[in-house]
């Protein structure tokens, strides 16, 4: 059976064996894969049933025959889809198939090769499709100081491709930098994020919070903006007042005491995400690696469902997040946040719910390109105040400016 012609001739002379083979063929098995797997079975069938013997029906639970069929699937999956198995199993099936010539087998990228390739590219792919936030011109020394405070506290995009940097000069990004993006700024600088926020008036000049609130009250025609999160008090002690909240952010939430997460929360969830990491990594290898045409939502969803868990998806209008950088063009955007087992995975922002969800899934999947993922306790903004949250990050994680939480993290645990 050195060729397809010889296999066809053998099956023509042994119709009972041909009929038996059709019964063990997989329902969704392609003709090419079945052609080679069938040859694998025929080459080793005599070792199980004896030379010239008709194999027993599949439902008889013949152990040796079942083992042969399993080996044939292992060999086909390894050759044609890149599946990896223990070295002893691989050596066994390769020995059983040593005389089978496969001329059109695809090439596959292993997870280690994939990680090395991503590292070689640097961080350029992690910010794909994300544009820099615009920097406004300084109107005066006073406004200039305030503007620099706003820009310093805005998420900065690093290592962005040149064409994306050119586009970003006049518009805000549709996607938000996820929690997995590396940001080398010191963690303590995050505490000053909301000391000064300003809204734009009709002539493009920044207004203090109190003026912005009154100037943006006419609704529906231009769409309303929430007042910025914090305005400066006039008192000499330079303390800051409570942020102005939108309709969905009640004063009751602001008065609730903040709970604290402990290492027990992270230890309890880490084993699950270790298993999820392996599942996603192998699915990426089977799909030929991370690419723009990959269905990130399906890949992550099926991986989580295979571990008997549920992915939590939350949507909220961008204008309802007072801590999220906004401009006039982004008022109607939607923010999507992904969680699993109350752990934050990623966030996306877009003009539609589908766009926001696609960005969030893409950024979440990118996290699994790293060598390891860990659950950590990080600081995020919620309703204008700092709260603790459980966040999935890579082992080389440095505290970045995480986007504000859509829901109170402590109410999700």
UniProtKB/Swiss-Prot annotation:
Keywords annotated in UniProt: Nucleus
Any matching Pfam family: XTBD
Gene Ontology CC annotations of this record: nucleolus; nucleoplasm
Biased composition, class Basic and acidic residues, residue ranges: 183-193
Places the protein is found: Nucleus, Nucleoplasm
Residue span, XRN2-binding (XTBD) domain: 21-118
Keyword Nucleus recorded: yes
Record has S-adenosyl-L-methionine as a keyword: no
Stretches for region Disordered: 118-266
PANTHER family named in the record: CDKN2A-INTERACTING PROTEIN, NF-KAPPA-B-REPRESSING FACTOR-RELATED
Family note: Belongs to the CARF family.
Record function comment: May regulate DNA damage response and cell proliferation.
Full protein name: Protein CDKN2AIP homolog B
Phylogenetic classification of the source organism: Eukaryota, Metazoa, Chordata, Craniata, Vertebrata
């Amino acid at each position: 059976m050195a060729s397809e012609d010889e296999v066809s001739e053998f099956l023509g002379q042994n119709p009972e064996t041909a009929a038996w083979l059709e019964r063990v063929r997989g329902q969704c098995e392609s003709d090419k894969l079945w052609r080679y797997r069938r040859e694998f079975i025929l080459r080793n069938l005599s070792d199980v049933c004896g030379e010239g013997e008709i194999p027993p029906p599949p439902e008889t639970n013949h152990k040796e025959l079942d083992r042969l069929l399993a080996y044939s699937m292992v060999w086909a999956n390894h050759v044609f889809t890149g599946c990896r198995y223990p070295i002893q199993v691989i050596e066994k099936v390769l020995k059983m198939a040593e005389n089978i010539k496969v001329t059109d087998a695809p090439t596959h990228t292993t997870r280690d090769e994939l990680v090395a390739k991503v590292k070689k590219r640097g961080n350029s792919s992690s910010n794909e499709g994300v544009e820099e936030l615009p920097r406004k011109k300084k109107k005066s020394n006073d406004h200039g100081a305030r503007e620099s405070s706003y820009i310093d506290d805005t998420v900065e995009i690093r290592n962005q491709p040149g064409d994306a940097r050119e586009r970003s000069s006049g518009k805000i990004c549709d996607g938000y930098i996820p929690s997995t993006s590396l940001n080398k700024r010191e963690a303590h600088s995050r505490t000053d994020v909301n000391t000064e926020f300003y809204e734009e008036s009709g002539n493009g000049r920044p207004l203090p919070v109190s003026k912005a609130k009154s100037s943006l009250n006419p609704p529906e025609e231009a769409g309303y903006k929430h007042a910025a999160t914090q305005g400066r008090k006039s008192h000499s002690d330079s303390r800051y007042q409570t942020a102005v909240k939108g309709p969905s952010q009640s004063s009751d939430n602001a008065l609730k005491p903040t709970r604290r997460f402990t290492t027990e929360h992270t230890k309890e969830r880490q084993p699950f995400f270790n298993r999820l990491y392996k599942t996603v990594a192998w699915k990426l290898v089977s799909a030929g690696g991370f690419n723009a045409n990959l269905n990130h939502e399906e890949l992550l969803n099926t991986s989580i469902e295979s571990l008997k868990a549920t992915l939590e998806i939350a949507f909220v209008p961008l204008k309802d997040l007072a801590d999220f950088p906004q401009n006039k063009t982004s008022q109607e955007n939607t923010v999507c946040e992904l969680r699993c087992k109350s752990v934050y995975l990623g966030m996306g922002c877009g003009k539609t719910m589908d766009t926001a969800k696609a960005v969030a899934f893409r950024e979440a999947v990118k996290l699994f390109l790293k060598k390891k993922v860990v659950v950590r306790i990080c600081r995020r903004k919620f309703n204008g105040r700092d709260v603790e949250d459980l966040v999935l990050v890579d082992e080389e994680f440095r505290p970045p400016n995480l986007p504000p939480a859509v829901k109170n993290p402590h109410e999700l645990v």
